[in-house]
């Protein structure tokens, strides 16, 4: 079993307006620098899959060895969703499912990469920030699309970066993980800074646009969703 959750940041029975206020309070708890002497041997991806029009979340973690990028552990959970889909409040809809999977992990990752935003968020409190606080682990947001901000020209070569600006502040980085392919948008979550977040995303994205952490977690939760649907058809 993985570690317990941080109770002060696991309030889900809130309205959207209450969630916004909670995000503002939680933002004050973020630490945007890695722990001193952080040694990363295991890095995880967290993801959730849902079916349109239904209120079930299929969540999972896959933990990879950082040297081989081979999976060493995984966990999954199926949870009923209670919070509506509201842009900017994704964590309140998705984290209860991801948290249930976290509690079933038998190997603690040193870093978690979320398929979503960290500080590149209207209130600087995306799912990677909330999740990092909840699990007490260094966390990174790596998103396929922008929620806020703009960036300047980005080179075509792998490893090219451009600061993501929002309201005069650098909130993340556009990162080219594969030559000639659309960038991903990287931002720190908790116990993380932007340069280190970019470094780790590039390290675990040797071939494809998305990090291997996200690719493995995405396959896991989609397989879980499909299996659930097939089981329902047999009933």
Swiss-Prot record:
Cofactor entry: Mg(2+)
Keyword Ribosomal protein attributed: no
GO terms (BP aspect): DNA repair
InterPro entries (alphabetical): Endonuclease-V
Record-stated family: Belongs to the endonuclease V family.
Free-text function comment from the UniProt entry: DNA repair enzyme involved in the repair of deaminated bases. Selectively cleaves double-stranded DNA at the second phosphodiester bond 3' to a deoxyinosine leaving behind the intact lesion on the nicked DNA.
Protein name per Swiss-Prot or TrEMBL: Endonuclease V
Taxonomic source organism: Myxococcus xanthus (strain DK1622)
